[in-house]
């Protein structure tokens, strides 16, 4: 099958690193760590697994970080090489293992890509998985599979940047007939935002800032609009087309994230700006809760400076190497936390699985996110697809996906 793979032996890594500094185009190719090539289709690891023929495979910001060698080495123990890239997916079941008969060949599914205890045949499950906190699994490097936290970072299973991949029956979520492939492929990134919302849910009337209006920022707005509709959401959006999407999805206000935006951001958060001897101003007052969905160091600093004293900051953006002045964290007694992937949450008297809830919100129309898949490319046009995803300002891309 044709697929886009990643492997990083030292000579190839050094060549890619040097060439990529000349031009981004050199991050992919015959001599790069990321290559488009023919690979063997993955085998079913056991009877509990199914083979899935990919229909759409999304390009995630973390995938672009892998291609550009920007991912932190701290995450490397949770991968095994070579792997087929891609964890955002929708596909069609092509083969069933002997123990997966509750599904049918031909069914459309989207796959929760976490490779936690159940796919790894770990019994008993770890404490985190037993409690439904699958993103906190302590066995991502153990059990019946090679090391890897996700589909698309693990050798021998494939990924959604390939024609086929395999998944454990516990990972499958059926796609209703009324749900388009474009909607379904957004289930995974939207589930991350649903997980973040349940982990730090705004109360009615709270003021909320979403920093970044790429895919994750826009999906975060959609999640908040569906789950906390009485929160007042402001988005810091770099490009006008992103601001337009944000307003359609439920934001109350969009602040342009270019040029001198701090005064307007302070106004939106009802903050008073104080100018230190050196550096950017700090806000007194501000937003009750901030979700950082982009921006690296700058996004984190804006969050710390414009969240009110005693407020909450949530990091979704997979920021790795960041230089940040952390003074506002203690000066304003902020609570800051990271969020990864998806899991289960107690909400009222019910337990909510964030991945399944994301699929339900999209299918029911409460999260009208299908229009965010703005570009689709055949896999052979991988160079153009990756370039389009990188150049959002010029291409006005939100979610770019490979179409099979």
Labelled PLM ranges:
Residues 1-7, 11-18, 280, 284, ...:
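C-terminal capping/lid region of NAD(P)-dependent oxidoreductase domains
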Residues 1-88, 163-164, 403-404:
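Short N-terminal strand-loop motif that marks the start
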Residues 6-9, 200-204, 210, 221, ...:
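Glycine-rich cofactor phosphate-binding loops and adjacent beta1-alpha1 units
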Residues 40-57, 72-130, 174-178:
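Glycine-rich beta-strand-centered segment in the early N-terminal region that forms part
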Residues 76-78, 87, 117-211:
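NAD(P)H dinucleotide-binding glycine-rich loop of Rossmann-like/cofactor-binding domains
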Residues 172, 176-264:
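Mid-domain Rossmann-like dinucleotide-binding core that forms the NAD(H)/NADP(H) cofactor-binding site
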Residues 267-280, 284, 323-373, 383-384:
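C-terminal substrate-binding/catalytic core of Rossmann-like NAD(P)-dependent dehydrogenases/reductases
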């Amino acid at each position: 099958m044709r697929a886009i793979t990643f492997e990083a032996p030292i000579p190839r890594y050094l060549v890619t690193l040097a060439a990529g500094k000349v031009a981004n185009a050199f991050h992919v190719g015959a001599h790069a760590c990321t290559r488009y090539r023919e690979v063997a289709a993955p085998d079913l690891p056991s009877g509990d697994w199914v083979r899935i023929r990919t229909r759409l495979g999304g390009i995630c910001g973390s995938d672009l970080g892998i291609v550009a060698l920007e991912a932190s080495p701290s995450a490397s123990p949770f991968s095994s090489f070579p792997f087929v890239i891609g964890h955002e997916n929708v596909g069609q079941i092509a083969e069933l293992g002997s123990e997966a008969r509750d599904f049918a060949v031909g069914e459309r599914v989207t796959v929760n890509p976490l490779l936690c205890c159940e796919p790894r045949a770990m019994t008993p499950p770890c404490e985190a998985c037993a409690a439904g906190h699958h993103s906190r699994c302590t066995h991502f490097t153990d059990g019946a599979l090679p090391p890897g936290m996700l589909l698309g970072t693990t050798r021998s299973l494939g990924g959604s940047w390939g024609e086929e991949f395999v998944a454990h029956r516990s990972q499958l979520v059926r796609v209703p007939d009324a749900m388009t492939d474009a909607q379904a492929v957004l289930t995974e990134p939207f589930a991350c935002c649903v997980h973040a919302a349940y982990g730090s849910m705004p109360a009615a009337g709270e003021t909320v800032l979403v920093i970044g209006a790429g895919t994750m920022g826009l999906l975060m707005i959609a999640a908040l609009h569906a789950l906390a509709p009485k929160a007042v959401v402001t988005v810091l959006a770099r490009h006008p087309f992103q601001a337009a999407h944000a307003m359609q999805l439920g934001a109350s206000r969009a602040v342009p994230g270019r040029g001198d935006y701090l005064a307007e951001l302070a106004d939106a958060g009802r903050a008073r700006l104080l100018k230190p001897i050196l550096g950017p101003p700090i806000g007194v007052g501000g937003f009750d809760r901030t979700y950082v969905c982009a921006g690296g160091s700058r996004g984190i600093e804006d969050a710390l400076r414009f969240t009110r004293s005693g407020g909450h900051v949530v990091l979704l953006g997979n920021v790795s190497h960041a230089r940040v002045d952390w003074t506002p964290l203690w000066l304003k007694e902020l609570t800051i936390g990271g969020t990864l992937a998806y899991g289960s949450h107690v909400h009222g008297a019910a337990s909510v699985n964030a991945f399944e809830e994301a699929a339900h919100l999209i299918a029911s129309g409460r999260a009208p996110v299908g229009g965010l898949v703005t570009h689709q490319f055949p896999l052979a046009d991988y160079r153009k697809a990756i370039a389009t995803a990188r150049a959002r300002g010029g291409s006005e891309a939100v979610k770019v996906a490979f179409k099979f």
